[in-house]
């Protein structure tokens, strides 16, 4: 009883503190602490004391100065860390992108590092997470919102603030490095940091409060390590207006399948009868369904009783389909309107050997020297750059097309693929055999679909951002098993375009001096 009461008060404290946003200048203290977001107490990684990590906010044009102070002590979740600011282009600050051994050496425990980057031309919904091994699964993951004072969608909603951010988290009772290499499902789904597991049927659920007659811009963020979720709110349609930081033409849906690391803004009109309505986030595998309030939260109208909903789910009739998404403002597709009509086309063949994933016959093994440091030290060609077979130089100012055919040889589909440093045009989506060179959505994480559907997802982007940029499956357990490559973009200009601070240059000597137990 004592532990349960303690866990209840810990949960209350976490909820109370997790709503306070920080930024654009902030200190992030990364530490180990016991948490119980689903009523089960476990050691985890907290940022400024909370799980999920606190909301970071700013506005378009801001300079973000985010000082990461590593005080980690538990080697089973790693003592070092490195943070990726997901969705930001990091033009001129490739060193601040975050992936360990691609863009930097990890920050050692007992040290801090300042991520200092500008966001001149991006606004929308982003997130941040550890980019070292599977560390973000243990708690280092949180939402990041950049507001646009001139938001073209502003007339469509009345409320857009800290209370309208919705995070979806797969939560595990065992630390990622101590559990199975490929877990068969999470113990709980957390919505805004709260949820229930099979062993904690009375744990608190998140409550999202609305007032009748108001329109809310909700920012749905998948901070998942693995599953995708089908998200819906009983009795309400959702109007999607933003996709991964890209404004989109308004699209009315009644459910959203959201893959790991994707984000959507949707407008909800609180025009239904005052009451309580189930918010649902059903994972694609593991403990599915909603029995006893699992995979759920509560939408509560002002004036409704403090009670769990009694609403029932209806069959989705207008689910979100990616090919129905289009940018709000015209965004020309790089290249010419034919398959392969680009300066450089690459096909990525996926494989798996029971332990590791492969792309074009290479599994990504983190190099001891970060790719950016290799380039700054003079490495220029694929032959020079490590890991061998996993680094693809891309020419400057060129159009690039990547095909990612789904295959039964790479189990665990659909695999959501994320490209760092860019948003890309999705010219062929999962579930579709047609190519759209006119007005496809641009985004930074795309589902590569399933072999059963014969999917051959195809994306395009322009090389306008010198630096090494990771492309990888965002199922963190798959990334840790090598499901990644690096694009070394415009290698000749990387050094001039990305001046590195001295503190960055100090990271590797410090990290390389650590014993394995202190890494």
From Swiss-Prot:
Entry keyword annotation includes Metal-binding: yes
Keywords: Copper, Disulfide bond, Glycoprotein, Lignin degradation, Metal-binding, Oxidoreductase, Repeat, Secreted, Signal
Signal sequence residues: 1-20
Cofactor(s) this protein cannot do without: Cu cation
One of the record's GO cellular component terms: extracellular region
Catalytic activity: 4 hydroquinone + O2 = 4 benzosemiquinone + 2 H2O
Binding sites annotated in the UniProt record for Cu cation 2: 86, 129, 474
PROSITE patterns: MULTICOPPER_OXIDASE1 (PS00079)
Binding site for Cu cation 1: 84, 418
BP term (GO), one: lignin catabolic process
Protein localization: Secreted
Family under the similarity heading: Belongs to the multicopper oxidase family.
Protein's name in the database: Laccase-2
Species, as recorded: Trametes versicolor (White-rot fungus)
């Amino acid at each position: 009883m004592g532990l349960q009461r303690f866990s209840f008060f810990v949960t209350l404290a976490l909820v109370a503190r997790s709503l306070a946003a920080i930024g654009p200048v902030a200190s992030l203290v990364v530490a180990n602490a016991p948490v119980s977001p689903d009523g089960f107490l476990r050691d985890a990684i907290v940022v400024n004391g909370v799980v999920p990590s606190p909301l970071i906010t700013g506005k378009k044009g801001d300079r973000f100065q985010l000082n990461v102070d590593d005080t980690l002590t538990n080697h089973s979740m790693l003592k070092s860390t490195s943070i990726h600011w997901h969705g930001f282009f990091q033009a001129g600050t490739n060193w601040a992108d975050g992936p360990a051994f691609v863009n930097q050496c990890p920050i050692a425990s007992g040290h801090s590092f300042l991520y200092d980057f500008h966001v001149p031309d991006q606004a929308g919904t982003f997130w941040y997470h550890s980019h070292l091994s599977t560390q973000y699964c243990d708690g280092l993951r949180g939402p990041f919102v950049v507001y646009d004072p001139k938001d073209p969608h502003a007339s469509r909603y009345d409320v857009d603030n800290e209370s309208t951010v919705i995070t979806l988290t797969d939560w595990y009772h065992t630390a990622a490095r101590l559990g199975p290499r490929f877990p068969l499902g999470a113990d709980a789904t957390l919505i805004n940091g709260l949820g229930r597991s099979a062993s904690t049927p009375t744990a608190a659920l998140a409550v999202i409060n609305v007032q009748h007659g108001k329109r809310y811009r909700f920012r749905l963020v998948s901070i998942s390590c693995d599953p995708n979720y089908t998200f819906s709110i009983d009795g309400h349609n959702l109007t999607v207006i933003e996709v991964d930081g890209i404004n989109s033409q308004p699209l009315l849906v009644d459910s959203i399948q959201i893959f790991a690391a994707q984000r959507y803004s949707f407008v909800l009109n609180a025009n239904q009868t005052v009451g309580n309505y189930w918010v649902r986030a059903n994972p694609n595998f593991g403990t599915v369904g909603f029995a006893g309030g699992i995979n759920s939260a509560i939408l509560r109208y002002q004036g409704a009783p403090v009670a769990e909903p009694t609403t029932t789910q209806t069959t989705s009739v207008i689910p979100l389909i990616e090919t129905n998404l289009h940018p709000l403002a015209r965004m020309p597709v790089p290249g010419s309107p034919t398959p392969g009509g680009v300066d450089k086309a690459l096909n990525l063949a996926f494989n798996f050997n029971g332990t590791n994933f492969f792309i074009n016959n290479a599994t990504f093994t983190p190099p001891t020297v970060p790719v950016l440091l290799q380039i700054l030290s003079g490495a220029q060609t694929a032959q020079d750059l490590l890991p061998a077979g996993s680094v693809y130089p891309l020419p400057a100012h060129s159009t690039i097309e990547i095909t990612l055919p789904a295959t039964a040889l790479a189990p665990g589909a659909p695999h959501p693929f994320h490209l760092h440093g860019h948003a890309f045009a999705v010219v062929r989506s999962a579930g579709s055999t047609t190519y759209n060179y006119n007005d496809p959505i641009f985004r930074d994480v795309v589902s590569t679909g399933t072999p059963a559907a014969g999917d051959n997802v195809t994306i395009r982007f322009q090389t306008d951002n010198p630096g090494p940029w990771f492309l990888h499956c965002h199922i963190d357990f798959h990334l840790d098993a090598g499901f990644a490559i690096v694009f070394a973009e415009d290698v000749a200009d990387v050094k001039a375009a990305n001046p590195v601070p001295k503190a960055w240059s100090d990271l590797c000597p410090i990290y390389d001096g650590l014993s394995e137990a202190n890494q």
